[in-house]
Amino acid sequence: MTSTPHHPDLRSQLETLTTEAFRPELAEIDQLPTLDIARLMNGEDATVPAAVAERLPEIAAAIDAVAVRMARGGRLIYAGAGTAGRLGVLDASECPPTFNTGPGQVVGLIAGGPDAMVTSIEGAEDSPELARADLDALALTADDTVVGVSASGRTPYAVGAVEYARSLGALTVGLACNRDSALAAAAEHGIEVVTGPELLTGSTRLKAGTAQKLVLNMLSTITMIRLGKTYGNLMVDVRASNEKLRARSRRIVALATGAADDDIERALTATDGEVKDAILVLLADVDGPTAARLLAESGGHLRAAMAAALG
């Protein structure tokens, strides 16, 4: 299990990380006009997608592996500290309304627990034991996936989570923003998006955080596409929990079917508001219970259910 390094050792570690590098050409950035600083920052941010693009093969391989586990009932679990942990919690929290996932299907763990979302929890990121306890509380199984997220790639909480998860047979992914990181080495799927030195020295909530957000977007979104949570580029598993989402549900059914508003309302009523079921009712001319059965038999994949209904 990873141990917390002493301060001199940690300082020497940080000096080797590109995300911590000092940029002398920016030493007087505080003397520049605001617009010039904004242009500099925007230019820095524009380099991030290219850094992510270099790692697309590794990202795609991880997604395919995650989808296999989740299709067997496994969970997607993010583990990180500070900004990295908050980004994992954010991505996990968006999955239920977007893809109608169960509350425990995509989970974000942040070192120090929920309070760490808004305040710093002293020493939490330095504890691999805390990561192990957090995973034990979830009753981790071999069908689950743990994604450790850390800009430095050395955060003990993230590395510890991946090491422990892998020891239990779970799938592991390590997302870091430095080369040759301990986190990527500990994981079955290492993804190192090298974003380089930050505009503000060591402030990895900037380019590194942006890169992490882009990769987490891909991990969750494309995994859900693989699991049949979309129909084309339509969010057919959206959970209509408010008026905006109810309106979006009607629009999705309209885009998928071209049906009249009255027919859409009848189909949504017949399927208790389930968008995917309503589309099947309209396109395959089946009733609500039949649509639900066909989708269940097709593992939730609308195209497969449609083929079964029409074939």
Swiss-Prot record:
| Main function | Specifically catalyzes the cleavage of the D-lactyl ether substituent of MurNAc 6-phosphate, producing GlcNAc 6-phosphate and D-lactate.
Keyword terms, alphabetized: Carbohydrate metabolism, Lyase
Q: What is this protein called?
A: N-acetylmuramic acid 6-phosphate etherase
Which InterPro entries does the protein's record reference?
Etherase_MurQ, Glucokinase_regulatory_CS, MURQ/GCKR, SIS_dom, SIS_dom_sf
Q: Which SUPFAM superfamilies match?
A: SIS domain
- Gene behind this chain? murQ
Query: Any miscellaneous information on file?
Result: A lyase-type mechanism (elimination/hydration) is suggested for the cleavage of the lactyl ether bond of MurNAc 6-phosphate, with the formation of an alpha,beta-unsaturated aldehyde intermediate with (E)-stereochemistry, followed by the syn addition of water to give product.
- Reaction equation(s) it catalyzes: N-acetyl-D-muramate 6-phosphate + H2O = N-acetyl-D-glucosamine 6-phosphate + (R)-lactate
PROSITE patterns referenced in this protein's UniProt entry, alphabetically: GCKR, SIS
Assembly and partners are described as: Homodimer.
Q: Which pathway does the database say it acts in?
A: Amino-sugar metabolism; N-acetylmuramate degradation
The record's family statement is: Belongs to the GCKR-like family. MurNAc-6-P etherase subfamily.
Q: Which residues form the active site?
A: 94 (proton donor), 125
Pfam families, per database record: GKRP_SIS_N (PF22645)
Residue intervals of the SIS domain: 66-229
Enzyme Commission numbers on file: 4.2.1.126
Statement: the UniProt record of this protein carries the keyword Cytoplasm:
no
For this UniProt entry, the molecular function terms from Gene Ontology, in alphabetical order, are:
carbohydrate derivative binding; carbon-oxygen lyase activity; ether hydrolase activity
The record's PANTHER family line, in alphabetical order, gives:
GLUCOKINASE REGULATORY PROTEIN (PTHR10088:SF4)
Provide a GO biological process annotation. Answer: N-acetylmuramic acid catabolic process
Q: Which HAMAP family match?
A: MurQ
Q: Is this entry keyworded Repressor?
A: no
